[in-house]
Amino acid sequence: MISKEFLESLIDLTEEQGIDLCRENGYDFRTVSKDGVSYIITMDLRFDRVNFEIEDGLITSANVG
C-alpha cells in the first residue's frame, strides 16, 4: 500500500523525478492533469498506482488510484 508520507514526498518534484521515485518503489503512475488540462483516464481504482497532477512542470497533487 502506498503511504501518505510517500505521496507527500512527491509534491514539488518534477514529473520526471516523481516517475523515477515511483519506479524505484515499484509503483505504477500516471499523469491525470497537466497545467489545468485533465486527461481521459480509466476509472479503475488501483492501490499500486499514483495519480499525478502537474502545474508548471511540478507535481502539485499525488494520490492513490
Feature roles, as predicted:
Residues M1-G65:
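Exposed, flexible binding/inhibitory loops of compact, secreted disulfide-stabilized domains
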